[in-house]
């Protein structure tokens, strides 16, 4: 990005604005609270407290045009091979809508719709049984997305199925889950793109034995034959996924089977509709008015021009408590790259460390550091305008904290006592959902997906591979024999010492 024609001008704006007070930016642009706000369907975004002005934004958009961001979105939606290292498309958008005239994308949409029909039929079959509980086994993209959506949208009472998620290879996770369940009234779903994932195979074996066989086991995989063979699952209970959908972008596919069981098939389809609505906004809206573009460019500005190494996400709705964990994978696995598409080294820092939690709990843990620490941490504050619970006073208090915390972070407060002085200057974006509906959540997740893609285009990296996760898995596989007491050649001296400790 630093090699673009417009970078020097952008850098000059950063030098000018780095020490600017956010109240001064608001005073200089009186219409800023509304001019820096956007509404897309049930989602409202306010960027007014970010540390840029119109001139800096114009420079950011100039680089986005130089990087052909609009063309990059066309290539993504049309099913071109944007995942160049694996020579694949990234057609997660086709799982939820048919927005182009590209045959590849239209065929993918039709294929996904057919699989959803099969999934709906399997749900109807399960509803006709005595099964009350579902254990969903997967990890990473096969777990974080479904777990987030199921937790956010599950009904308070009256759900047909209780869905339990197990991801960690630690046997304690499976033990605690199964201890509360009756095998005669439980079904299992094994989700793995390759069906070679260690965690899913080990946990799947435990679940298979506990259920007494495969009669109530289902699978979702891009390798359905291997899935069926590994656990003797009938082919009719195996749903496909595809190599043109990355795991962290797959909750819209049959990977969403546990979502549909937890919240109902109709509401699962509404989730997809909300995502498709936001996709249409991204595809058809000019860059300057495009929320995902503005969100992604803001992340680039904070990372590369203002030097922020981390980004916090605070969800002021307890039902969205898992969103920061989901976004950690979406953002950091997608953007944690050190080489560009052509294999050359990047010319700027890439991904920030994403972290966060649910408000107001986080105000009593890490907000001290946000307000008075030496690091400036940009943040997203996410809340809901209307709540579904009967405790209106609690919701008013919750939203008062969103308003207060974002104001305090931005404006600060002087004091003659340095221990009680707040420097301010901490930028944040406020995102408000009209209500936490499937459509709104679908749109919110879609926005973050596209924001990630914007950042990848600006940096010239591939957002759709994840080779960085492989080496550790390979080494773990090689070390298994040594941990079991078998002879093994372990070259690393520290690993040898740790092995001796573990083997007693």
Swiss-Prot record:
SUPFAM superfamilies the record matches: SIS domain (SSF53697)
A GO term for molecular function: glucose-6-phosphate isomerase activity
Enzymatic class: isomerase
Active site (record annotation): 333 (proton donor), 364, 473
GO cellular component terms, semicolon-separated: cytosol
Localization, UniProt: Cytoplasm
Catalytic activity: alpha-D-glucose 6-phosphate = beta-D-fructose 6-phosphate
Biological processes per GO annotation: gluconeogenesis; glucose 6-phosphate metabolic process; glycolytic process
Pathway it works in: Carbohydrate biosynthesis; gluconeogenesis; Carbohydrate degradation; glycolysis; D-glyceraldehyde 3-phosphate and glycerone phosphate from D-glucose: step 2/4
Keyword Isomerase applies: yes
Translocase is among the record's keywords: no
Keywords: Cytoplasm, Gluconeogenesis, Glycolysis, Isomerase
Enzyme Commission identifier(s): 5.3.1.9
Known role: Catalyzes the reversible isomerization of glucose-6-phosphate to fructose-6-phosphate.
Stored NCBIfam families: PRK00179.1
Family classification: Belongs to the GPI family.
Name this polypeptide is given: Glucose-6-phosphate isomerase
């Amino acid at each position: 990005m630093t090699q673009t024609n417009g970078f020097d001008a952008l850098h000059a704006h950063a030098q000018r604005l780095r020490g600017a007070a956010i109240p001064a930016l608001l005073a200089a642009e009186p219409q800023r609270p509304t001019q820096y706000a956007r509404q897309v369907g049930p989602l409202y975004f306010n960027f007014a407290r970010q540390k840029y002005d119109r001139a800096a934004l114009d420079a950011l958009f100039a680089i986005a045009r130089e990087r052909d961001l609009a063309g990059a979105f066309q290539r993504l939606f049309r099913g071109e091979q944007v995942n160049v290292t694996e020579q694949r498309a990234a057609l997660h958008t086709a799982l939820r809508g048919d927005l182009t005239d590209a045959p590849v994308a239209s065929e993918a949409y039709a294929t996904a719709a057919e699989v959803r029909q099969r999934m709906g039929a399997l749900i109807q079959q399960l509803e006709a049984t005595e099964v009350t509980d579902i254990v969903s086994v997967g990890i990473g993209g096969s777990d974080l997305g479904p777990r987030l959506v199921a937790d956010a949208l599950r009904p308070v009472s009256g759900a047909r199925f209780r869905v339990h998620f197990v991801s960690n290879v630690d046997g304690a996770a499976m033990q605690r889950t199964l201890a509360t369940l009756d095998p005669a009234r439980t079904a299992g779903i094994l989700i793995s793109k390759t069906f070679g994932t260690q965690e899913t195979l080990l946990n799947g074996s435990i679940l298979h034995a506990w259920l007494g066989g495969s009669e109530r086991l289902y699978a979702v995989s891009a390798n359905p034959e291997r899935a069926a063979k590994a656990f003797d699952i009938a082919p009719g209970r195996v749903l496909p996924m595809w190599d043109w959908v990355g795991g962290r972008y797959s909750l819209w596919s049959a990977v969403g089977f546990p979502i549909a069981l937890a919240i109902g098939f109709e509401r699962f389809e509404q989730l997809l509709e909300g995502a498709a609505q936001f996709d249409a906004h991204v595809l058809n809206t000019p860059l300057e008015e495009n929320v995902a573009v503005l969100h992604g460019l803001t992340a680039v500005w904070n990372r590369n021009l203002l030097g922020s190494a981390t980004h916090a996400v605070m969800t002021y709705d307890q039902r969205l408590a898992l969103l920061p964990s989901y976004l950690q994978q979406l953002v950091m696995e997608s953007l944690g790259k050190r080489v560009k598409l052509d294999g050359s080294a990047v010319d700027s820092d890439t991904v920030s460390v994403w972290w966060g939690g649910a408000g107001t709990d986080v105000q009593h843990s890490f907000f001290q550091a946000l307000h008075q620490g030496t690091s400036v941490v940009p943040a997203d504050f996410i809340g809901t305008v209307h709540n579904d619970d009967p405790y209106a006073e609690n919701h008013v208090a919750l939203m008062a904290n969103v308003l207060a915390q974002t104001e305090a972070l931005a404006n600060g407060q002087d004091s003659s006592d340095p221990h009680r002085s707040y420097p301010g200057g901490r930028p944040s974006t406020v995102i408000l959902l009209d209500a936490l509906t499937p459509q709104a959540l679908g749109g919110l997740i879609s926005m973050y997906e596209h924001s990630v893609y914007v950042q990848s285009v600006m940096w010239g990296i591939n957002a759709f591979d994840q080779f960085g996760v492989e080496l550790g898995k390979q080494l773990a596989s090689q070390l298994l024999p040594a941990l079991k007491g078998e002879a093994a050649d372990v070259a690393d001296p520290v690993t040898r010492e740790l092995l001796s400790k573990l083997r007693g």
